[in-house]
Amino acid sequence: MTQFDHDRLLIIDFGSQVTQLIARRLRELNVFCEIHPFQNVTDAFLADFAPKAVIFSGGPASVIDANSPRPPASVFELGVPILGICYGQQVMMQMLGGMVERGHGTAEFGRAYVTPQGDRPELLNGWFLDGREQVWMSHGDHVSRIAPGFEVYGTSPNAPFAITADLARNFFAVQFHPEVHHTPNGKTLYENFVRLAGFTGDWTMDAYREQAIAEIRAQVGDGKVICALSGGVDSSVAAVLIHEAIGEQLTCVFVDHGLLRKNEAQEVVTMFREHYNLPLIHADETELFLSALDGQSDPETKRKIIGKLFIDVFEAKAKEIGGADFLAQGTLYPDVIESVSFSGGPSVTIKSHHNVGGLPEKMGMKLVEPLRELFKDEVRALGHELGLPASFIGRHPFPGPGLAIRCPGEITRPKLEILREADAVYIDQIRKYGLYDEIWQAYVAILPVRTVGVMGDGRTYDYACALRAVTSVDGMTADYYPFTHEFLGETATRIINEVQGINRVTYDITSKPPGTIEWE
């Protein structure tokens, strides 16, 4: 089964940071969807894509500005349901004859409450059962006059046209973001939309597996693939999937860059050689990486150095096996959106990612990224589909640059050893308390400061470290984990007593946003 066997929903991306969450919510409903940037959606594209429904994403622009993003007018002539979200509502209203105005005292950012107005359309089945709905707003401009044919079905204090619809054409538009978790009943709205559009929910991880295998075979042909295997869930699922697709045409390379956790290198090599029978080259390049990182403290510089050296190593290993045509990576959606908009649209860059921003434009191999359109929980579901053990699939994410981005400032061997030991104690504590599976990601960061302490009768002047643990569904947003004081106190005591070089332990309670999950 390929993607063309499915009815497809088109998401037109206007640059919102949460466009990928729209796709995530639809995938939870087993609906096949694709995200495409507005500038790529032409009349010819629409005719070829033939969507069964269309969603307009939000975005940072103002429809009032000249040359603001907009879809082709022909999208409204397709005869399919359309849902506009935030900026998507505003562009729909303006293009269909309504009016949008600048927000002067009417902007809404954050939690808001929408109350119903008029009869309840099918889109709102299951809504307003308690009289109002909590939603997440993020808009400066606002609709001041709805387009002909539209009616109002929900209002908020600063958005009198919070929910509008033209029921004759199945056009719907909302000012809020139903895709984020801060709109608790948002999933119900999407369920209603895809149901009225006629989707049957036939897209599953089994279907994705078959589709991905077919696409890998079509892309690779008779070529050789070298896979960047880190031992993390992402690269491991990618490796097993690619191996299922092309067998011995795949060679995995595990690079020990000297930035791995305690005992990690040997565990990875043993696991994949003995249990998964994958062709594996173990390249210990500790000296190469640490020498290149010596004296570097800027996080972007560190990421770029690591990314470049990864490519250098893979190209060298490819030559050793007689040449490779493709480089495989376990790149995911959040990796890409945090580097630059996945769609190439106007989304704002947050940070470069080692799988993306660190790659030279003219590398010697083409990329194979079979997980590029998946979120972490989908990768785990795919791993289960591929037969990987649950204990492995449930491992916390670990970044490609490894401990380099958990060591703010300059990287030294002594600091890395301290960090490894502290991290091992912390994770042991989390497992001891039975909390590992409740947490999305947990780690220790060693801080670039020393603090004065007293141990016994002596003065110490050692490093401080920060514990980090977050809960998340998809990595796009995250909250800190609410450990008990007992846990934090016991963990701090263990680290200070068992890890030479640390005399102060802190706990990072920053959510994402405004912070990111990793320190760098």
UniProtKB/Swiss-Prot annotation:
Instruction: Report if keyword Oxidoreductase is assigned.
Output: no
Parts of the chain that traverse the membrane: none
Q: Which InterPro entries match?
A: Class_I_gatase-like, GATASE, GMP_synth_C, GMP_synth_GATase, GMP_synthase, GMPS_ATP_PPase_dom, Rossmann-like_a/b/a_fold
Q: Which residues form the Glutamine amidotransferase type-1 domain?
A: 8-202
Instruction: Write down the chemical reaction(s) this protein catalyses.
Output: XMP + L-glutamine + ATP + H2O = GMP + L-glutamate + AMP + diphosphate + 2 H(+)
| Catalytic-site annotation from UniProt | 86 (nucleophile), 177, 179
An MF annotation (GO) of this entry: ATP binding
According to its record, what are the GO cellular component terms?
A: cytosol
Which part of the chain is the GMPS ATP-PPase domain?
A: 203-395
Pfam hit, one: GMP_synt_C
The alphabetical list of record keywords is: ATP-binding, Glutamine amidotransferase, GMP biosynthesis, Ligase, Nucleotide-binding, Purine biosynthesis
| Enzyme Commission number(s) | 6.3.5.2
Pathway participation: Purine metabolism; GMP biosynthesis; GMP from XMP (L-Gln route): step 1/1
Binding positions (ATP): 230-236
**Its biological purpose:** Catalyzes the synthesis of GMP from XMP.
Q: How does it assemble?
A: Homodimer.
What protein does this entry describe? GMP synthase [glutamine-hydrolyzing]
Species of origin reads Dinoroseobacter shibae (strain DSM 16493 / NCIMB 14021 / DFL 12)
